[in-house]
């Protein structure tokens, strides 16, 4: 039965006959209704809809950030440079799915290349490779004036 349920927001809208603007999803973590901006961000991050008791759920921005922090703290395994990840997995980083450990967006080629070129490590968290997207990279490297 789970295989027949829509896995993303676009398929959910199509299969249920509800327009994106009329879609209302609750957050799986805090149960609040996602705003239109949060629904858009959820879709753009290519996150899957979660099904509980026959109902679809998403995740709000605040809970996604919090869950990323919790997962990083509880489930961080180790970190490697891009070359180390490629050596360990026997695959080019370009063919692997790597998500941002902060916002969960899949990294695009340019973001993966930036990790390689600027010698930034990727992190194995709960068995999956994670890095920083462009937005979170800038957010994490902001210098606070003294």
Swiss-Prot record:
Q: Name one Pfam family in it.
A: E6
Per UniProt, which keywords does this protein have?
Activator, DNA-binding, Early protein, Host cytoplasm, Host nucleus, Host-virus interaction, Inhibition of host innate immune response by virus, Metal-binding, Modulation of host cell apoptosis by virus, Transcription, Transcription regulation, Viral immunoevasion, Zinc, Zinc-finger
Which stretches does the record call unnamed zinc fingers? 27-63, 100-136
Record bears the keyword DNA-binding: yes
A single Gene Ontology CC annotation of this entry is: host cell nucleus
Which GO molecular-function terms appear in the entry? DNA binding; zinc ion binding
Against InterPro entries, the record matches this protein to: E6 (IPR001334), E6_sf (IPR038575)
Its subcellular locations are: Host cytoplasm; Host nucleus
What is the protein's known function? Plays a major role in the induction and maintenance of cellular transformation. E6 associates with host UBE3A/E6-AP ubiquitin-protein ligase and modulates its activity. Sequesters tumor suppressor TP53 in the host cytoplasm and modulates its activity by interacting with host EP300 that results in the reduction of TP53 acetylation and activation. In turn, apoptosis induced by DNA damage is inhibited. E6 also protects host keratinocytes from apoptosis by mediating the degradation of host BAK1. May also inhibit host immune response.
Subunit structure of this chain's protein = Forms homodimers. Interacts with ubiquitin-protein ligase UBE3A/E6-AP; this interaction stimulates UBE3A ubiquitin activity. Interacts with host TP53 and EP300; this interaction inhibits TP53 activity.
Miscellaneous comment text of the record: Belongs to the low risk human alphapapillomavirus family. The cancer-causing human papillomavirus E6 protein has a unique carboxy terminal PDZ domain containing substrate but low risk E6s do not possess this domain.
Q: This protein is called what? A: Protein E6
Native species of this protein? Human papillomavirus 28
């Amino acid at each position: 039965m789970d295989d027949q349920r829509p896995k993303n927001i676009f398929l959910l809208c199509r299969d249920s006959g509800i327009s994106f603007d009329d879609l209302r999803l609750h957050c799986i973590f805090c149960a609040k209704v996602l705003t239109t901006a949060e629904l858009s961000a959820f879709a753009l991050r290519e996150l899957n809809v979660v099904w509980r008791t026959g109902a679809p759920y998403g995740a709000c921005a605040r809970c996604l950030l919090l869950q990323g922090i919790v997962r990083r703290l509880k489930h961080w395994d180790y970190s490697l440079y891009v070359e180390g990840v490629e050596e360990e997995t026997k695959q080019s980083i370009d063919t692997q799915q790597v998500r941002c450990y902060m916002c969960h967006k899949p990294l695009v080629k340019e973001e993966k290349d930036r990790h390689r070129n600027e010698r930034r490590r990727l992190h194995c968290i709960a068995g999956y490779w994670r890095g920083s997207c462009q937005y979170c990279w800038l957010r994490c490297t902001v210098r606070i004036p003294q």
